[in-house]
């Protein structure tokens, strides 16, 4: 049966996702940056309160995936901490200046990761040649690749996703579709034979604050709503998981 990973930007969201039936959580912070490394406090709290597999992302900053020496050392330190805390896996990715997998650095990451299941994240979608990147990641023995098929969303990238699934049919990383995967389009990915789906399955929720200071934001964008935040929608996760169960070969023959 196709598995559902839910992208969570807080431990609260991870707990909601677990209760709603998610198979796994990708734990991040920094939604506006597309996902950054969660704090040590968040890692510890997730480890203590969430029982399904949690894979924290290790991404020290927004922007591209070609990192400075300091960035890379920080990443290795974060991976070591995640490993030592006993998480099931980690989500990471490093490219070189020409848009290829940075093999020397990824070998270091695989070594530091130890027994962690490594997901190569959507840095894959910024690679110059996806099939060469796939071969390199298979050589590294990464567990899975999170990808939109090198398009802005995974539905637009279905053609490449199908090619990647076909190329890994017998062996190689699991292809996990992500970016714009929703209840309304997930059947397309199931029909394409994709084994794992990644979704934020979320909504914007209002602040609980009664007093709301007007005219001040915490960033350069003065139009940002400081009195709302993004959160996993448990009902959406439940509905997505139900569709996955009903769409499985076993369910169709019972």
Swiss-Prot record:
Its main location: cytoplasm. InterPro entries: CutC-like, CutC-like_dom_sf. GO terms for cellular component: cytoplasm. It is found in: Cytoplasm. The keyword Cytoplasm applies. One of its GO terms (molecular function) is copper ion binding. It comes from the Bacteria. Keywords: Cytoplasm. It holds the Pfam family CutC. NCBIfam families: PRK11572.1 (NF008603). PANTHER family: COPPER HOMEOSTASIS PROTEIN CUTC, COPPER HOMEOSTASIS PROTEIN CUTC HOMOLOG. Belongs to the CutC family. This is PF03932 family protein CutC.
């Amino acid at each position: 049966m196709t598995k559902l990973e839910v992208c969570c930007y807080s431990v609260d969201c991870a707990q909601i996702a677990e209760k709603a039936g998610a198979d796994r959580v990708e734990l991040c912070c920094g939604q506006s940056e597309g996902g950054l490394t969660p704090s040590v406090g968040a890692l510890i709290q997730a480890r203590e309160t969430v029982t399904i597999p949690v894979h924290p992302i290790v991404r020290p900053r927004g922007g591209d995936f070609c990192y400075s020496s300091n960035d890379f050392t920080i990443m290795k330190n974060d991976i070591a901490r995640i490993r030592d805390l006993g998480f099931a896996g980690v989500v990471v990715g490093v490219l070189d200046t020409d848009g290829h997998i940075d093999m020397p650095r990824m070998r270091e990451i695989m070594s530091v990761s130890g027994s962690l299941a490594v997901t190569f994240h959507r840095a894959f979608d910024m690679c110059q040649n996806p099939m060469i990147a796939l071969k390199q990641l298979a050589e590294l023995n990464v567990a899975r690749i999170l990808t939109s098929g090198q398009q802005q969303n995974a539905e637009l990238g279905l053609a490449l996703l199908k090619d990647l699934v076909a190329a890994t049919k017998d062996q190689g990383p699991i292809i996990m579709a992500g970016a714009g995967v929703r209840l309304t389009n997930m059947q397309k990915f199931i029909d394409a034979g994709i084994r794992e789906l990644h979704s934020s399955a979320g909504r914007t929720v209002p602040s609980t604050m009664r007093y709301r200071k007007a005219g001040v934001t915490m960033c350069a964008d003065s139009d940002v709503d400081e009195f709302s935040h993004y959160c996993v929608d448990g009902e959406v996760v439940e509905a997505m998981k139900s569709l996955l169960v009903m769409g499985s070969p076993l369910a169709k023959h019972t």
